Curated annotation (Swiss-Prot):
SUPFAM superfamilies: PCD-like (SSF55248). Its EC number is 4.2.1.96. Has a role in spore wall formation. Belongs to the pterin-4-alpha-carbinolamine dehydratase family. This is Pterin-4-alpha-carbinolamine dehydratase. Pfam families: Pterin_4a. It catalyses: (4aS,6R)-4a-hydroxy-L-erythro-5,6,7,8-tetrahydrobiopterin = (6R)-L-erythro-6,7-dihydrobiopterin + H2O. It is found in: Spore wall. Keywords: Lyase. It comes from the Eukaryota. Gene3D superfamilies: Transcriptional coactivator/pterin dehydratase.
């Protein structure tokens, strides 16, 4: 699947979709977990993958809620790195 098709798939899911923001230069998604421990565990897994990809999210955590924004600052837009990390995050979230 090409980059455009993958981006469309990420933002067009009927439930819990990623939202394009700031002129389609950022992806945003909010996640909720049973408690803080599950949220933190999720963030830890994402952090390990982000380090492997050398691509780090902008995120916040309040108790059981994690908000994630993805963008590539060097290009001031979305790149393959953002799509790879978003797809990993979605897969990980399904397991939680």
């Amino acid at each position: 699947m090409n980059t455009s098709a993958r981006l469309l798939a990420l933002v067009s899911k009927s439930k819990n979709n990623w939202i394009l923001q700031q002129g389609d230069t950022k992806l945003f998604k909010s996640f909720r977990f049973k408690n803080f421990i599950e949220a933190w565990g999720f963030m830890s897994c994402v952090a390990l993958r982000a380090q492997q990809l050398n691509h780090h999210p902008e995120w916040t955590n309040v108790y059981n809620k994690v908000d994630i924004t993805l963008t590539t600052h060097d290009t001031k837009g979305l790149t393959e790195k953002d799509l790879k990390l978003a797809e990993f995050i979605d897969t990980l979230a399904k397991d939680n």
